[in-house]
Curated annotation (Swiss-Prot):
WD repeats lie at residues 304-342, 344-389, 393-431, 532-573, 621-666. This is Eukaryotic translation initiation factor 3 subunit B. The modification N6-acetyllysine is found at residues 181, 260, 336. HAMAP family: eIF3b. It comes from Bos taurus. It comes from the Eukaryota. Belongs to the eIF-3 subunit B family. Component of the eukaryotic translation initiation factor 3 (eIF-3) complex, which is composed of 13 subunits: EIF3A, EIF3B, EIF3C, EIF3D, EIF3E, EIF3F, EIF3G, EIF3H, EIF3I, EIF3J, EIF3K, EIF3L and EIF3M. The eIF-3 complex appears to include 3 stable modules: module A is composed of EIF3A, EIF3B, EIF3G and EIF3I; module B is composed of EIF3F, EIF3H, and EIF3M; and module C is composed of EIF3C, EIF3D, EIF3E, EIF3K and EIF3L. EIF3C of module C binds EIF3B of module A and EIF3H of module B, thereby linking the three modules. EIF3J is a labile subunit that binds to the eIF-3 complex via EIF3B. InterPro entries: EIF3B, eIF3B_RRM, Nucleotide-bd_a/b_plait_sf, RBD_domain_sf, RRM_dom, TIF_beta_prop-like, WD40/YVTN_repeat-like_dom_sf. GO terms for cellular component: cytoplasmic stress granule; eukaryotic 43S preinitiation complex; eukaryotic 48S preinitiation complex; eukaryotic translation initiation factor 3 complex; eukaryotic translation initiation factor 3 complex, eIF3m; synapse.
Length: 786
């Protein structure tokens, strides 16, 4: 090793040979410290770039330690000692100077002197005469240069705020306090600058944060902040000005994107027999099928293995089928259920669609960081682009974001805060959240941009339910409540009524009393009616298209169901109460009027089919251990099922009519889930629907004929085949009759003018014969004979 160093730097070797070991260890000579790193850089970098090494073979070192490989293009390994000194002692500038000096010495040095020093012929490490050093500093000193100061350091922590009020010296201090209060919540402000002109501020300011991340946070959250009616802040990074100034003045025409034809995504609505579709997951989730609902037997449309890893979900209008995968969500649609879109979200577990089917919300507990929120992501379904990410609190309940009926707004509730966002910007409405101390729950109206929320009691302040109009944030109704334990918000499907179920503990009593506060939303000043019940409430449900609601109350085995009607005069009338019901859930038909009272799971699947027009029980049945009940979108059929997810045996789904008549029993191995495909809202007006109901008798004959055909034992294909055969026979018969009539004259000539086509043409040739049958009559007496 020592010989190799002497060959490369003979002067350094001579200087190190004279001092004693203590001096060499304590304070090396300057020449040695500079020369050795320089030689390292030249040998390791320049020779490698120069290509082939010295001409002719090279002799190995005499002592055997510092062997140099004579292979062309190869460089000797640097000594470990010098490597340590290069990394730990020599600065970048000294290393470059030493490399230059070593290169010049190698090029102009005396090769004979090197041979004498080494005592043998050693390889030459000098560069060729035409060698050009093209190794950049970034390649040689990347680890050192990465820490050098950058020009942008400090600048990318500066933001520019426009639309700031222009004030004089007397109000400048007050303005600074307001600005500091708004922008200091994003991070520590280290410097500010308020440009002035003619004794007044110019309307824009500069703020510097301690960190670029704080500046970026301020831009994201403060841009568009409304200070007052005349001033709305526009916030940008200072570095953005350079970016916008370097934009080319020449406009580049964007490439035209080819239109991707997805086909008719709502083809199933044009089905001739107006049948509905539903999805089925079975074999413990390994297989997924889509069926047409047919009275006789379900008709399979599509079946795939491992289509989803957990479960599936239809979009609100039935356009898309969502499947779950470890890496994200996929949407399918069209006649062949091709993939329409996919969204990458690792470990996704829950999803939610906006009512307009424009946006998709996904949740994953795996991906979330403080700087880049990924727990909840909102996607644009049409483009597949991520719109915004959000953090998720551990105590939140799904759906965390609740959508308005038209998809224009969505909101979330956190501690003492209600945040309302607007689309498509995904930003806060008016750039700020609502501060509502103690807010417990909220819900959107299905019929308008009205939000309802409730706040519990706080010392002497009563609990209250508030109705707020958006986007104006006007409170249209406030209802104060006392002695409140809990509240639940129940909207009627059209938004005509809001029921607030209030559990109270009246003073002087130990039990819990339930009040149903009914808000009549379509009337002036939103009047409220109250129904009080002292029994335990099991379930509550509004009629979807009507003004009735049902309540399950009591305790097993004395459970009752009560049906109420909200009249136009404001009175709430009890229509009917059924005692001794085995039910724990209420399922209204989507069209109203009919309801199924089901005792699911622990109540062994007891079913009661009720017509609320006259409050009669049409049928009582049972589907043992039923876990789910699903109405079809039209309200004609209802499915009860036993899911493998809740019960491991007798997994199947049964199809019933709305009257409670059982049509099918479909058993599937490890059946898991059945979901009807939703239908979009009808395009018909209420007047058109009324006219159709009036003319329904005209179509009844057609419907009855179709019903008879569908109830026939022969399949549809067999009936069609028979109809085709009958039509072919009629055509053949007509053709044969025409040929028969054409040949009549020929027959008359052959038979001497006698028309044998008629039976009475020749009466003389008739022969009459009488045939007698002998009949035996036997009388058998019935009963006892005395």
């Amino acid at each position: 090793m020592q010989d190799a160093e002497n060959v490369a730097a003979p002067e350094a070797a001579e200087q190190r040979a004279e001092p004693g070991p203590e001096q060499a260890a304590a304070e090396p000579s300057p020449g040695a410290e500079v020369a050795r790193p320089g030689v390292q850089e030249a040998a390791g970098g320049e020779d490698a770039e120069a290509g082939p090494g010295p001409e002719g073979p090279a002799e190995p070192a005499a002592d055997g330690e510092g062997k140099a490989d004579a292979t062309p293009g190869a460089t000797p390994p640097p000594p470990e000692e010098s490597s340590a000194q290069l990394a730990g002692e020599a600065p970048a500038e000294q290393a470059q100077d030493a490399a230059a000096e070593a290169g010049s010495e190698g090029a102009g040095g005396d090769p004979d002197g090197a041979a004498e020093d080494g005592g043998a012929d050693e390889p030459s490490f000098s560069d060729p005469e035409d060698f050009v050093d093209d190794v950049s500093e970034e390649e040689l000193l990347a680890d050192v240069l990465k820490d050098r100061p950058q020009e942008a350091d400090g600048i990318d922590s500066v933001i520019v705020v426009d639309n700031v009020p222009q004030v004089g010296p007397d109000r400048l201090e007050k303005l600074k306090n307001v600005i500091h209060k708004i922008f200091s919540k994003f991070g520590k402000i280290t410097n500010d600058f308020y440009p002035e002109e003619d004794g007044r501020t110019k309307g824009y300011i500069f703020l510097e944060y301690a960190s670029p991340a704080h500046a970026l946070d301020a831009v994201k959250n403060a841009d568009g902040y409304k200070l007052d009616k005349q001033h709305t802040f526009r916030v940008n990074l200072f570095t953005d000005f350079d970016k916008y100034m370097t934009i080319s003045d020449e406009w580049d025409i964007p490439e035209k994107q080819p239109f991707k034809d997805l086909g008719n995504l709502r083809y199933w609505l044009e089905e001739a027999e107006c049948r509905d579709q539903y999805s089925v997951i079975f074999e413990s989730g390994d297989r997924t099928s889509i069926f047409w609902n047919d009275v006789k037997d379900p008709v399979s449309i599509e079946e795939r293995a491992r289509w989803t890893e957990t479960y599936v979900r239809w979009s609100p209008k039935g356009t898309y089928l969502a499947t779950f995968h470890q890496r994200g969500i996929a949407l399918w649609g069209g006649e062949k259920f091709k993939q329409i879109q996919r969204f990458s979200h690792q470990g996704v577990q829950l999803i939610d669609f906006s009512p307009c089917e424009r946006y998709l919300v996904t949740f994953s507990p795996l991906m979330d960081t403080q700087d880049d929120p990924q727990a909840i992501i909102i996607w644009d379904i049409l483009t597949g682009q991520k719109k915004r990410g959000f953090h998720c609190e551990s105590s939140a309940h799904w759906p965390i974001f609740k959508w308005s009926h038209d998809g224009k707004f969505f909101a979330r509730m956190t501690l003492d805060t209600l945040s309302i966002y607007e689309t498509p910007s995904m930003g806060l409405l008016d750039k700020k959240s609502l501060k509502i101390s103690g807010i417990k729950d909220f819900s959107w109206s299905p019929g308008g941009n009205i939000i309802a929320f409730w706040v519990p009691e706080d010392k002497d302040i009563p609990a209250r339910v508030t109705l707020m109009q958006l986007p104006t944030r006007q409170e249209i109704r406030v209802r104060n409540l006392f002695n409140v334990v809990d509240c639940k918000l129940h909207w009627q499907k059209n938004g005509d009524y809001l029921c607030v179920k209030v559990d109270r503990t009246p003073k002087g009593t130990q039990g819990v009393v339930t009040n149903f506060e009914i808000f009549r939303m379509r009337e002036k000043q939103v009047p409220v009616d109250v129904v009080e019940m002292k029994e335990t409430i099991i379930a509550f449900a509004w009629e979807p298209n009507g003004s009735k609601f049902a309540v399950l109350h009591g305790e097993a085995p004395r459970i009752s169901v009560s049906f109420y009607h909200v009249k136009n005069n404001g009175k709430i009338e009890l229509i009917k109460m059924f005692d001794k019901q085995q039910a724990n859930t209420i399922f209204w038909s989507p069209q109203g009027q009919f309801v199924v009272l089901a005792g699911l799971r622990s109540m062994n699947g007891a079913l009661a089919f009720v017509d609320t027009s006259d409050c009669t029980v049409m049928n009582i049945a049972e589907h043992y251990m039923a876990s789910d009940v699903e109405w079809d979108p039209t309200g004609r059929y209802v499915v009860t099922s036993v899911s493998w997810w809740s019960h491991k045996v007798d997994n199947a789904y049964w199809l019933w009519t709305f009257q409670g008549r059982l049509l099918q029993k479909n058993s599937k191995d490890r059946f898991c889930q059945l979901l009807w495909r939703p239908r979009p809202p009808t395009l018909l007006s209420q007047d058109q629907i009324k006219q159709i109901k009036k003319d329904l008798k005209k179509y009844s004959k057609i419907f009855e004929q179709k019903d008879r055909l569908s109830q026939s034992k022969a399949s549809k294909e067999l009936v069609e085949r028979r109809r085709t055969m009958m039509e072919d026979f009629r055509k053949y018969r007509k053709m044969a009759q025409e040929l028969y009539m054409e040949q009549k004259n020929a027959r008359l000539e052959l038979r001497g003018g006698v028309d044998t086509d008629e039976l009475d043409s020749n009466v003389d040739d008739w022969e009459e014969e009488t045939i007698e049958f002998f009949v035996t009559e036997e009388i058998i007496p019935l009963g006892n004979q005395e």
